[in-house]
Amino acid sequence: MNNELLECPCCKNRTLSELGAYEVCPICHWEDDPVQSNEPDYAGGANQNSLNQAREAWEQSQ
């Protein structure tokens, strides 16, 4: 069993135990929605903003 954490699609920190399982990143608070991972411009679903919008906001906050 591999216990290595996986990269958050938003902030790129290794915080997720499984991709697409709707886990919330404890660093950037992105909820890993598989629909938004496949369609990064889609706003709605588990997150109000699209993945691309959230990535941009995260980068600007750093």
Give residue ranges: language-model regions.
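Short cysteine-rich clusters marking metal-coordination/redox-active sites
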Residues: 8-11, 25-28
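Short, intrinsically disordered terminal segments enriched in charged and Pro/Gly residues
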Residues: 37-62
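Residues immediately within or flanking Cys/His clusters that coordinate Zn2+
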Residues: 5, 22
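Gly/Ser/Thr-rich helix-start
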Residues: 21, 30
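Intrinsically disordered, low-complexity regions enriched in Ser/Pro/Gly/Gln/His and often acidic
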Residues: 23-24, 51
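Short, non-ligating residues that shape and space the ligands of small metal-coordination modules
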Residues: 17-18, 33-35
